[in-house]
Amino acid sequence: MGMAMRCVLVLFSVSPVLLLFNFEMLEVALHLASREKELDTAAVTPSASLSFLSRFRIMLGMNHHRSRGRRHKRYSEAPAPAPAPVPAHQARSEAPAPLVHVPRKGMPSTHRSHIAPARSPVHKVKDGGHTKIPRSAIVALGVVGLCLVVLGVVIAAFSVRRSRKFKKVCTKAFKPFRHGSRDQRSPAATRKVSSHPSPDPLTLSSIVQYQQNLPNLKQSSESKSLSIQSTIPMGTELIVSDHAVINNSQSDEVESFHSIPCSDLSAGSITELPQQICDRRAIMNRSEYFLQTHDSPSDSSYQSLSPDCTSRLSPKDQTFTASSHLSLRSKTCPEKSDGENAEINCHDGLEITCISGSMEHQEAPIEERARINFRNPPSQHIFPPSYRTDTSQSKINIAFTMTNSKVESSSKESSRIETSSSMGIPKPAPPPPPQKNPPPNLKGQCYGQPPPPPPLPLQIQVGKDGSPLPRLKPLHWDKVRAAPNRSMVWNDIRSSSFEFEFDEQMIKSLFAYNLQGSMKDEEAMNKTASTTKHVIEHHRLQNTTILLKTLNANTSQVCNSVIQGNGLSVQQLEALVKMKPTKEEEEKLLNYDGDINMLDPAENFVKVLLTIPMAFPRMEVMLYKENFDDEVAHIKMSFAMIEGACTELKSSKLFLRLLEAVLKTGNRMNVGTLRGGASAFKLDALLKLADIRGTDGKTTLLHFVVKEMARSKGLKALEKLNETPSSCHDTPTEREEYSSMGTEFVSELSNELGNVKKVASIDLDTLRNSISNLSCGLAQLRNLVEKDLASDDKNNNFLQCMKSFLNHAENTMQGLKADEAQVLLNVRELTEYYHGEVSKDESNLLQIFIIVKDFLGLLDKVCREMRGTKHNQTLNLVLPLK
């Protein structure tokens, strides 16, 4: 009986005792209360005859003696008061004469009885002043008892649950050792003989047959008998034969493996080792010891051996006889499916034997056994894949138990083997060297997936002389798939259609991979990176290195050009100006006294440039000189476009006619409002014409204005041709003809105002900044020529070159500033011409050109729609244009 069940029985036996103890304590309390006052005959006296149910009711406070109600009053009244009975050991006092009360028949009594009601046995009326025993005390006693019972039940449940968990852990721990009885196991586990015929033991032909039947044996889960002959380090052999299953109907037995000694005896035969079943207690004790000496039963790295077996596994022994109890857990199948430890070789001496009861083997020749020895290294333990356990377990353990109940017999057996080996019995041949790489087919089987396909052979292109072509730099393009159902230009091109042949030597020299050169460059860069000292900040140093590569000139050429003041292009000067260091970096480079080769090439280049007086200011004025003419030409062209746009807007009659049509149409639309009767409007109202739509949802007010202008132009053109007066009551067909004739005239407005569109893209602030930059550059050039370099005679060439340019730049800047003032004046006059006032913000002086440009875009769109539409909706003329 388990410990949990014992605890439960003890708690259940203690609980009634506690309840009875509470009842006895209550009885004693009642007895003490009854000694002071005898209850009347109707009351219940505390005696030994008090029933169990009455005690329980008194404990719970359910047995109260209360007086009855008024309606039962006459039945509860006694004819005469009677004293309470006195115990026999006390002397009786004379009772007073009873007063006889004669109740009236049929009439209820109107007076209440003055006789005290019968008291409960727990009341005391003597001088001691004892009161009723508190009900809370009684309830507390009951609650305490119930709590003890509940506590006992909870402890029992917790113990049962803990015992179940412990059983589960033990079951998992002994799962490799204990498989249950024959009735509880599956048929596949109890079946001793495999459905597949096993090969004859210790023959080479059987090994070949086993290798052929290996895939079938892998899928079969019923074959449980195996014989493993492995090579122990230093020439030791281990042969594990089929295991015998001992069934016991009364208790679970342990499956044990029996081994057969396979040493080379002088008798030339292998004797049968009788099966000895070890005691169940011994197995359990060893299993418990095994669990105590290891942290986890699922650990795949432990290995338990008996002392005798361990002592016999010495390098001097040539054979190993498994005659003592051995519990072995192999390291071959860890949780991580290590391919090297789990790989199987079909030629590793595996034998399948079908044994029922006792085992009989014939002795195999020494030569055959030497061939069948394991070929894997001693550090690896390899097992066939058909006997692998389920990989879903946390760690796979293979236990070989070789049972023998007596340790003395194992020692005798070992001594007998030692004597036989010392008598000169020939030793078996040494095993062959271990196999480095397992076969690929078994490697794929071990991982549970097919082996990967072999890599495709690389196609080596061969030239005309038969030598392999070297690899060149690739040309990255996108291949086009050939379309068999479509004719393409590539179908007419053949590889042999070229009239010329490649110059292989030239293409190799130009585009071949220079692996050695690149490696040398990398090594040189690494060496310089480890030995150089950086003065310039890292990010700026990288930019300087990139700019240095774009110069396409050496240091001496750059220095000579800077000294002379010419000879460098705009791109080179821009790169040199960007290399300008900060003041701190300039001081560090000038004060650097170490080895110049220790500096970075870019830093070394900048250091050489700093040796020239005013090197970077020279570069800046040289760049200013090269860009001066281009900047001035761009500014003058912008000024010319602005002047042309002002002239076009003032002189365009078509634009004036359009403004007239919009003014008349707007006044008609604003009749009856404050906006009506206008004589002028701002040009931004032209953009609002496209927002007002007609009832059809398509025609806008701009459509209407353009059609009327086109009709008016067409009518005038027709009058000039026919010299007939026009009529105000023209038919709709005639109006359509006039409109189609005048649409071309209206669309010409966009061509007349061509400069207006260009000026709209000009930013006046940008023009002003350009002129300001030119003025600042001119001032810097003047300071450099007149002050900084005037005292040095070595700079004569540079000064002469810059002085001539200085005079030209000063005259040009004076004319440019005059043009700027004139252009701004013309823009102000144009703004006043259309708007009547000039905005205070001078940055919006060109806003009028932007408005006209947007309106011309809307006008061109309407004209295209009118040309494309043949059947336009007829519009009635509201205001004829005169």
From Swiss-Prot:
Q: What is its main location?
A: membrane
Q: How does it sit in the membrane?
A: Single-pass membrane protein
Q: What's in the keyword line of the UniProt record?
A: Membrane, Signal, Transmembrane, Transmembrane helix
Does the keyword Membrane feature in the UniProt annotation?
Answer: yes
Q: Which InterPro entries match?
A: FH2_Formin (IPR015425), FH2_Formin_sf (IPR042201), Formin-like_plant (IPR027643)
* Residue spans of biased composition, Low complexity class: 298-308
- GO annotation (BP), single: actin cytoskeleton organization
**According to the UniProt record, where is the region Disordered?**
67-92, 178-202, 293-316, 401-471
Residue spans crossing the bilayer: 138-158
Protein name per Swiss-Prot or TrEMBL: Formin-like protein 9
Lineage, uppermost ranks? Eukaryota, Viridiplantae, Streptophyta, Embryophyta, Tracheophyta
